[in-house]
Amino acid sequence: MICIFSVLYFFYKASIYRRITLSGTVKFFYSSIITGGLAAFLLIPVAISLSTGKADFNLFSEAITIKQNLSRFLIKLFIGSYNMGQVMKSPTNIYCSVMVAELLILYFFNKEINIRNKIASLIVMVFIALSFFISTFILLWHGFDYPIGFQYRNSFIFCFFIITLAYECWLKIKRSNFNGLIITVLFFAVASIYVSYGEYDYLDTNKIVSTFIISLCYIIVFMICIKFNGISRIILPLISLLVITELTLNAYLSMKNIKYIHKAHIGEYIETVSPLIEEVKSLNDNFYRIEQVYRNTLNDSMLLNYNGLGHSSSANEENTAKLIKSFGFKTSVINNVYNMGSTIPIDSILGIKYLISMEQPEFFKCYKYKQNMFYKKVKTEGSYAVYENPYALPIAFMVNERLESTNINEVKNKFVYSNDILKLMVNENYDIYKVLNITDIKLNNLSEVKYDDETVYQKEIKGVKSTIEL
């Protein structure tokens, strides 16, 4: 996206200054190639990493569609219009102060800025804005594939461009006219009324009213600048105070909506579990994995420095994720989660030798681990306990060559797949997992959803207890 914008911005500036020359264009592209070469030590590993995971060419994989409506674009002009729910599916993050939005409107009514510049600026704005609505342009700006989380990542480019236009208008504010001010007020008034009728869990009436009041304050300052023919010494401190107030309020309201784990809990958790991890690591000098039957963070293995299975990364290796999913673990495009445990055979194949559980769950109430008769408790630290899997296999072990015939792309039933893997490993026709003969199933607050050879149960009423009786 930086390359696209660099080319766009080069020709934009060249057209404004009317200096599009062959020599200048050659120098620009020559410099761009050198810049790309200097960054190759970083770009090449990233490209290789993405090629094994989420990267794909999807530019022509679907029909041209509209990905969001205008209201989702407008709400991002308001103070505090953000929450953590927008991480995976977010509207365009174009907020960069009400002042910038107003100056952008006034830019097109400023008499000192010639019509050629306005047309060129509008063309660039529209071209970038298309990538917020039309699927083909979104894919074009994002390397021909949709990003995982934090959508519309080129929004910072749009912000940069409109800030430069707003700054140019601010420098020439004395040449703005009152018609532009009236249109700006009407724009924010109509936008406020329009947005107030929508249902957004991160935007309420107080935020909308606050935004409109601040927009009026800016308008008053702009009127003073126009009336007194310039920016006086009083205006600069006043406008600075307004901007600082607005951005501080936006930061506070945005951060307030984000839920964090208490620092005291994390500190206590590390202080308690780290010594336990180190003791467990000292029990064996071979490669093995440690896992938890509760979930504190998605990357606890990195937090506590041990070899684990659970991992969260936006560049997940595709084949690893497929294998983990085929064994029945909870996965997504960015997460592999061990969760509440696995089966003994799968634990053993994956080298999971130690399991950490909470004996008396306080922070993890739903993760009380029920020890199976084959795992032995070897360590205890506070409310945490470590269980050892005596059947854990090393990092490499001999298997029958028939194992090569398996295909993780054809997996339907996880238990059948695990049986096939285990049988092929030892070349024996024996099923570890047996099908239960269930005569009756009673569901309470659950509904069945069939996926190939498996059944998934989903809650009908959230927040209400659900049970399955066999």
Residue ranges and their predicted role:
Residues I2-I34, Y218-I220:
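Perimembrane helix-loop-helix junctions
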Residues S15-R19, L50, K54, N58, ...:
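Membrane-interfacial segments
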Residues I346, G351-L470:
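Flexible, solvent-exposed extracytoplasmic
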Residues V87, L103-N110, E271-L283, Y338-T343, ...:
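Short alpha-helical segments and helix-capping/turn motifs at coil-helix boundaries
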Residues L242-G267, E278-I352, L393, M398-T439:
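Extracytoplasmic/lumenal acceptor-recognition loop(s) of multi-pass membrane glycoenzymes
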Residues I2-A14, I48, L106-F109, T164:
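Hydrophobic transmembrane alpha-helices of multi-pass, membrane-embedded glycosylation machinery
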Residues G24-A120, F127, I134-F156, S196-T205, ...:
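Periplasmic/ER-lumenal interhelical loops and adjacent helix-loop junctions
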Residues I119-L139, D145-T272:
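Contiguous transmembrane helix-bundle modules in multi-pass membrane proteins
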